[in-house]
Swiss-Prot record:
Catalyses which reaction(s): carboxy-S-adenosyl-L-methionine + 5-hydroxyuridine(34) in tRNA = 5-carboxymethoxyuridine(34) in tRNA + S-adenosyl-L-homocysteine + H(+)
tRNA processing as UniProt keyword: yes
Organism placement in taxonomy: Bacteria, Pseudomonadati, Pseudomonadota, Gammaproteobacteria, Aeromonadales
Single Gene Ontology BP annotation: tRNA wobble uridine modification
Family: Belongs to the class I-like SAM-binding methyltransferase superfamily. CmoB family.
Gene it is expressed from: cmoB
Top-rank lineage group of the source organism: Bacteria
Subunit structure: Homotetramer.
GO MF entry, a single one: methyltransferase activity
CDD domains reported in the protein's UniProt record: AdoMet_MTases (cd02440)
PANTHER family xrefs: METHYLTRANSFERASE, TRNA U34 CARBOXYMETHYLTRANSFERASE
UniProt keyword list: Transferase, tRNA processing
The protein, known as: tRNA U34 carboxymethyltransferase
Function description: Catalyzes carboxymethyl transfer from carboxy-S-adenosyl-L-methionine (Cx-SAM) to 5-hydroxyuridine (ho5U) to form 5-carboxymethoxyuridine (cmo5U) at position 34 in tRNAs.
Residues that hold carboxy-S-adenosyl-L-methionine according to the record: K91, W105, K110, G130, D152, P153, S154, M196, Y200, R315
Length: 325
């Protein structure tokens, strides 16, 4: 069973200490109430991962731990077999002792689009909402974050994160908690809050933006990445049923509408810093994620459209600053 005691001890000494009023009870409930049928199997795989000396750790140009010479061929095959127990791997990629985990998403490409526009992360307390397997948490640590906290309710993502952390030697600068943002109190403690690929899954996008604001300290920075459509300030796509075969897509605004939403929620210096069409090179089926991917969600006769006839995925990155309360 995954133990969160190290995180409790860590935040007891810093600006997040007030989180301890609610967090231990929430995570205790999660550990005892989570009924995902594969969780025992994933826990067994975590417990079987061998202890290795991490040696080389690269977190600035990617997430690369160890090298291909640090394990024997037999050990490497065992580690790869155990890591494959956590498929599908969606967010990455990772390289562990020469084993390349080729994830569905090239999350490093997204990071390369975001990084030039954000305030330096050195010494910052950072929250990543909907962090998936925690790939970007490690990149945040690579940029010098004092503490990178990710939240995502998926037990598989938590196990993937713990598998990677295991090979770092138990690095305590990054932590993933199996929670949704609606379960967080108003911490008002983070210097930077990221929400990437989450907003369009929320039934109330305004409420989500306000929840993000309530995690930031005054003058803190919001980094918001989401699907957008072309159009003016009043343009918002609400799919009648599915978008790219996903049922849980609710609101896809234009970049101008997104900017207005964020301004209305009490942010200043709001700006769109990047727009990018998602390509089938960035999101695709791999040997580590063998299910359907982006190419299956697009109209085969016109890849500018989804199979439902909506505009194909286009993503915008927005940066904003929290105005003082």
């Amino acid at each position: 069973m995954i133990d969160f005691a190290n995180f409790y001890q860590l935040i007891a000494k810093n600006r997040l200490s007030h989180w301890l009023h609610t967090l231990p009870a929430q995570l205790h409930a999660w550990q005892h109430d989570n009924l995902h049928g594969d969780l025992p199997r994933w826990n067994r795989a975590l417990n079987k991962l061998p202890t290795t000396a991490p040696g080389h750790i690269e977190l600035q140009r990617g997430v690369e731990i160890g090298n291909s010479q640090s394990l024997s061929e037999g050990e490497r095959k065992k580690v790869e077999s155990l890591l494959r127990q956590f498929m599908p791997w969606r967010k990455g990629p990772f390289t562990v002792h020469g084993i390349h985990i080729d994830t569905e998403w090239r999350s490093d490409w997204k990071w390369d689009r975001v990084l030039p526009h954000i305030s330096p992360l050195a010494g910052r307390y950072v929250l990543d909402v909907g962090c998936g397997s925690g790939y970007h948490l490690w990149r945040m640590v690579g940029e010098g974050a004092k503490l990178a906290v990710g939240i995502d309710p998926s037990p598989l993502f938590l196990c993937q994160f713990e598998a990677i952390r295991h090979f770092t030697g138990g690095d305590q600068r990054a932590h993933l908690l199996p929670l949704g943002i609606q379960e967080l109190p108003d911490l008002r403690a983070f210097d930077t809050v990221f929400s990437m690929g989450v907003l369009y899954h929320r039934k109330s996008p305004i409420e989500h933006i306000e929840q993000l604001r309530n995690q930031l300290k005054d003058d803190g920075e919001l980094v918001l990445e989401t699907l957008v459509v072309d159009g003016g300030v009043n343009e918002v796509l609400v799919p009648t049923d599915r978008y790219g075969k996903m049922r849980n897509v609710w609101f896809i605004p234009s970049s101008a509408a997104l900017k207005l939403w964020v301004e209305r929620c009490g942010f200043t210096d709001v700006r769109i810093v990047d727009e990018n069409m998602t390509s089938t090179d960035e999101q695709r089926r791999t040997d580590w994620m063998i299910n359907e991917s982006l190419s299956d969600y697009l109209d085969p006769a016109d890849p500018a459209l989804t199979v439902e006839g909506h505009p194909a995925p286009k993503r915008a990155v927005l940066i904003a600053r929290k105005a003082k309360d």
